[in-house]
Amino acid sequence: AICGHEWSGTLSAVGSEVKSFSEGDRVVVAVAPACGQCAPCRAGQADRCFVSFMSALGRDAMAPKHGGFAPRIAVSASRIVKTNPALSDIQAAQVEPTTVAFHAVRRSGIRLGDIAVVQGAGPIGLGAMQWVKAAGAGVVIVIEPNEQRRAIALELGAHYAVAPGAAADELVKE
């Protein structure tokens, strides 16, 4: 299998039963849909769906054989979302991690003026940092071991970006 997630593409064909997409549509991958039947789904925690998780691991019938690094893949219509055709491939590929970051911040219950600590300044961490700022966090602290990523976090509006360790622990305690 060829790996790859956080991809975008253009549909080269659609199945005869598919009515919501057309050949030529620009799409991005979505997280596998929740089944609605397993224990987490019944408890209102669709983000922890067993079926969705197994699909993400390539272990069910809905999972594509190959990922986004393959030149062509077959994907269930339930796993894709139309995107703005004006977005570049790089921009469109950020839809999934941005959505993950948004969901995490929404679940956090952050309120206006809160202090937010974001662990990591990769794509999802930087997205979460921007979402907590948009949600009204008063102070945003990013903890990241990579100096270049810390610099990016500061450029994007973090109040502090520090390496993990005693200094980070002290800053968070303040």
Regions found by a protein language model. Give the residues of each.
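A short glycine-rich beta-alpha junction/loop motif
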Residues: R72-S78
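Glycine-rich beta-strand-centered segment in the early N-terminal region that forms part
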Residues: A1-R42, N84-L87
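Short amphipathic alpha-helix with an adjacent loop that forms part of the alpha/beta core around
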Residues: A167-E174
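Mid-domain Rossmann-like dinucleotide-binding core that forms the NAD(H)/NADP(H) cofactor-binding site
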Residues: S78, N84-A166
